[in-house]
């Protein structure tokens, strides 16, 4: 009789635990811990926890390691943040991660790109800063595609020399330290609030808080209206859970902490972007000059 009671109790606790178990959704970081991707992944993970998820941040550091992780049966569904520039860079290095209806969950945001100089520079516009120069060094994250400044050098007669850094945080440090003349980076809260730099132009089609659009300064540059679109890529999410995950990620985007983050950096939240995959491929097409066939 005692064994029967113990068995019933064990079954009861097993059922109860199953019913009340937290849903799992990890946030994977296919890069290092010094850039925006890591900070944003922690922001997303915390918001998921607020929604009742069991969520951990898993750092895989690069595309190859990330593919290996995705192939494992970890028993923990997840997502990772991936932007248009990173996709193109991964493809150029032969690290193909399929983007399709199954893997592309939804857009996190569309973010402006910006050009910044040190605050101690006397110039208050990019044209003023470039005036009289024959060469300018431009810091950027190493994940950007090759040749992005070729058109600028050709059209302005000024040699734009690219200097790569490992992550946007180190790019900013490089500018402040005087390692480069200017930087081209994502327009985020970090750049906006930093008193040691001034960001003077953006990829928006309209001025942003007094900053001129690139299209006004560099009217023929192929990236003058191109920002960065970042989306949630599914990792081992069961098909029957996908719709719930997508809906919950929309809640994450509109949560106070995440919405505030996006608003302060003048980003467009994914919940306001229509035809999201089409928007993704449109930017990829611009970045690659319509040469990228692989999807």
State each model region's role.
Residues 139-150:
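Secondary-structure junction motif
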Residues 21-102, 144-145, 156-184, 189-193, ...:
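N-terminal (or domain-start) structured segment
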Residues 77-79, 95-114, 137, 219-222:
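A structural signal for short loop-to-beta-strand junctions that line the ligand-binding cleft
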